[in-house]
UniProtKB/Swiss-Prot annotation:
Cellular component terms per the entry's GO annotation: plasma membrane
Domain of life, source organism: Bacteria
PANTHER family (UniProt xref): MANGANESE EFFLUX PUMP MNTP-RELATED
Keywords: Cell membrane, Ion transport, Manganese, Membrane, Transmembrane, Transmembrane helix, Transport
Protein name in UniProt: Putative manganese efflux pump MntP
Gene: mntP
HAMAP family listed in its UniProt record: MntP_pump
């Protein structure tokens, strides 16, 4: 139980790094504290909903796919980690949506899509659902708030490195799923 909790907290931190790195940029926009609160909370809610949907789908798939489900889950985590590792080095201009109304909804959805894949992986390997989604929701909320606050002051120094770290952590979990086999 403790080992699973630690693993889920590390994975939740890795997934929250994407939200953290994007929140760093959004933190430079001069948002009010009430806006920052809403942004972090909305991202957290989406980081509960998306992995929950993924875990339900993963449990259904694992019942039919058996051992292959572990390999598929590991593959998804490795793919997601590699995308996060490569992403900071791609030349692209990040555009920020207005962090209110539908813009906030679209922003939170886009930041939490990786949690859907992670949830699918966790569902396939039989992780504890409530523990996983609460860990992901809380961690992404806290990391988003942290990113927004740090972004107000230090965005140019931290930038893409947090996403890079998150990618390496997810790849590590993907490899861990493959090791027993």
């Amino acid at each position: 139980m403790v080992e699973e909790l630690i693993a889920l907290l590390i994975m939740a931190s890795a997934l929250g790094m994407d939200a953290f790195s994007i929140a760093l940029g959004m933190g430079t926009l001069g948002l009010r504290f009430s806006q920052m609160f809403k942004v972090g909370l909305t991202i957290g809610v989406f980081h509960v909903i998306m992995p929950l949907m993924g875990m339900v789908a993963g449990k259904l798939l694992s019942a039919h796919l058996g051992l292959f489900a572990n390999w598929l889950g590991a593959g998804l985590l490795l793919w997601l980690g590699l995308v996060m590792i490569v992403s900071p080095f791609q030349e692209k201009e990040r555009t920020f949506v207005d962090p209110s109304g539908i813009g906030l909804f679209v922003f939170a959805l886009s930041v939490s899509l990786d949690s859907l894949s992670a949830g699918l992986s966790l569902g396939m390997v039989g992780a504890k659902m409530a523990l996983a989604v609460v860990a992901m929701g809380v961690m992404s909320t806290v990391l988003s708030w942290l990113g927004l606050f740090i972004g107000m002051r230090f965005q140019r120094y931290v930038g893409p490195y947090s996403e890079l770290l998150g990618g390496f952590i997810l790849c590590g979990f993907g490899v861990k799923l493959l090791l027993p086999y």
